[in-house]
């Protein structure tokens, strides 16, 4: 992170604090991706889905926000998203791979070395890292386990600022930098970025709750107000979230705040602990999607089209090839399913009628409108489903054999016996209502 949070003095120090006259415009590669220079920082401005996303590049490191770093691969994915000519298939693939959560809701870690810290300061740092772990895990399913030989894990370093990589990436070590070693909640804030959690003010529905005027933000800080359309906010907008910034953060003039409530009033921030909304969001993100097989439980899948219609196995039959349909909600086992992890991100969806039978794309089809059926589990790609956490909108499902398609209610109908199929989408970031489902745990 390029800033220090000095809680006691209330002072916000920015490394990027020069005036506009220091900016030098460089040739743009396209209207969808322009770059400017600011004191050794390359500011990338990307037009994605009609909104601008900013990424700051400093010495080959990419900052998605002041305290969020992304890999070169993730940055290149954003650049591809800024290309209006990419196919729906590629766009869908990018969305599904940009941010990943930790497998089995388990975050492996190593503790920092003492470095330049005094013995007392070092012991305080270690104590507060463990307090941050406890703060997160006390009311969630997430576990923090000290690393033995795992390839992916988080590390901590005392630094001049706070920052963390974004989410889990295969074969990557997430190096978390901490300046505020005496504040467990700030350490938790950065750990949550490594868990794949964004800032509250950047959720896609923020305009329903706050006004953001980035013209009031200091040069080089607009990336802190990116709208994360691929990030799903859960619950009501949470002004008390540990992931929320205050009105005047990054403001040129504190009397002209970057953010206000809709009525024009300002708000502060807290770094004392996680809010109830933070815990609810983590539990949704790391709920059935990332739980271990022992704790997945049994769920119903309700369409977002109608709260009283569930995915159903026709006639409660367990014969191979049985149609999967929409039907009025009941308490029958024909509407209950068990999620079992197949590989990271992918799950099989088993019928409680017969746990050897799973939801399957018929004949391994990849065409729009291909039916979904019940069939004996053969561990094929047509039986593995990538789950998209859509926050308040529930979940979306993409079959591994056809990753650009989504599980959907055919034609968006809500009549009984409507087939469940896989269908194309032009709205990979905001899926059609017919492609959204709520998972409700029934035991």
Swiss-Prot record:
Its cofactor is Zn(2+). The active site is at residue 190. Residues 297-440 form the Ricin B-type lectin domain. CDD domains: beta-trefoil_Ricin-like, ZnMc_astacin_like. Residues 16-91 form a propeptide. Zinc metallendopeptidase that cleaves preferentially on N-terminal side of aspartate-containing substrates. This is Flavastacin. The keyword Protease applies. It comes from Elizabethkingia meningoseptica.
